[in-house]
């Protein structure tokens, strides 16, 4: 029997019938969600607060998690510098070993943080076995329990991940303004934005106005923006009909537009392309993407379970980036409209900053458009 240092047992269940028992940490309780994994070796506070993980149970493949604890939030200009949102977004966390922290700026342990926010965790389980299951069979629904006796985990799965519009949980209810040196406005359609994206946009010097995910084209254009950004967010893009419709309406104004992650997928759908569920997705901070225009390869951060393939791209677009590992299209450029997209996260957080220049490219598009 596994010795649990906190005296709490836990379990992780996959819908294929796999059931592993280990040690519980964090909050006591039972949660269900889509089981996914990340190969990132660090950056767990950023990953766990990334709204794109909403509705998912996250397995971290690195064997030791919690080493450097959890810092106090640092906020500048209304933007978090060391978290991607104000709360933990994942449904639960699965690790091989949950360790006690040892770092000068740690304010609390991973266990304490998760307990405070009501998120269960399970450790002392074979994460390699779980990841191999997900890689072989694909992402699947699962149940995580900490400190709770669960007879039949299957009964806790209420809905399929692909059927839920998670943006209603991650989008702001009203507009949020980040005033900057320039009065010129960039409207950011916020379906669950990472604060790393906010920070990079703020560095462009423009005032950023975050509007709710389902904002209409008229509501967006009321701000007289110089450019528009459709950011990341959780869930299945194919069920976000209103968002796709609004994207199409916004593009009629021919303003410089940047789509990131979910924004890339929504752009693809709005322009007549297809977006497919991937077998187990890309979730890592060291994924390669190749710029087709110059054959340069960059290392980038990814978090997506849906993808666009070469045969799926919309008319009048050309591939900008592609993942050389599996051929997934990681960026598009429109041939006639001032639109660029990336499936990967050019802001990283966590991850390398090889592609932060994408935001400067967008800034140049906005300035060029102003000069016309």
Curated annotation (Swiss-Prot):
InterPro entries on file: Anth_synth/Amidotransfase, CarbamoylP_synth_ssu, CarbamoylP_synth_ssu_N, CarbP_synth_ssu_N_sf, Class_I_gatase-like, CPSase_GATase1, GATASE
GO biological-process terms attached to the record: 'de novo' pyrimidine nucleobase biosynthetic process; 'de novo' UMP biosynthetic process; glutamine metabolic process; L-arginine biosynthetic process
Matches recorded under CDD domains: GATase1_CPSase (cd01744)
SMART domains: CPSase_sm_chain
Active site as annotated: 261, 345, 347
Pfam families (alphabetical): CPSase_sm_chain, GATase
Domain Glutamine amidotransferase type-1, residue spans: 185-372
CPSase: annotated span: 1-186
Binding positions for L-glutamine per the UniProt entry: 52, 233, 235, 262, 265, 303, 305-306
MF annotations from Gene Ontology: ATP binding; carbamoyl-phosphate synthase (glutamine-hydrolyzing) activity; glutaminase activity
Catalytic activity: hydrogencarbonate + L-glutamine + 2 ATP + H2O = carbamoyl phosphate + L-glutamate + 2 ADP + phosphate + 2 H(+)
Pathway note: Amino-acid biosynthesis; L-arginine biosynthesis; carbamoyl phosphate from bicarbonate: step 1/1; Pyrimidine metabolism; UMP biosynthesis via de novo pathway; (S)-dihydroorotate from bicarbonate: step 1/3
EC number(s) stated in the UniProt entry for this protein: 6.3.5.5
Keyword Transmembrane helix: no
UniProt KW keywords: Amino-acid biosynthesis, Arginine biosynthesis, ATP-binding, Glutamine amidotransferase, Ligase, Nucleotide-binding, Pyrimidine biosynthesis
Family recorded in the similarity comment: Belongs to the CarA family.
Matching NCBIfam families: CPSaseIIsmall, PRK12838.1
Function: Small subunit of the glutamine-dependent carbamoyl phosphate synthetase (CPSase). CPSase catalyzes the formation of carbamoyl phosphate from the ammonia moiety of glutamine, carbonate, and phosphate donated by ATP, constituting the first step of 2 biosynthetic pathways, one leading to arginine and/or urea and the other to pyrimidine nucleotides. The small subunit (glutamine amidotransferase) binds and cleaves glutamine to supply the large subunit with the substrate ammonia.
Self-association state and partner proteins as the record states: Composed of two chains; the small (or glutamine) chain promotes the hydrolysis of glutamine to ammonia, which is used by the large (or ammonia) chain to synthesize carbamoyl phosphate. Tetramer of heterodimers (alpha,beta)4.
Protein name as annotated: Carbamoyl phosphate synthase small chain
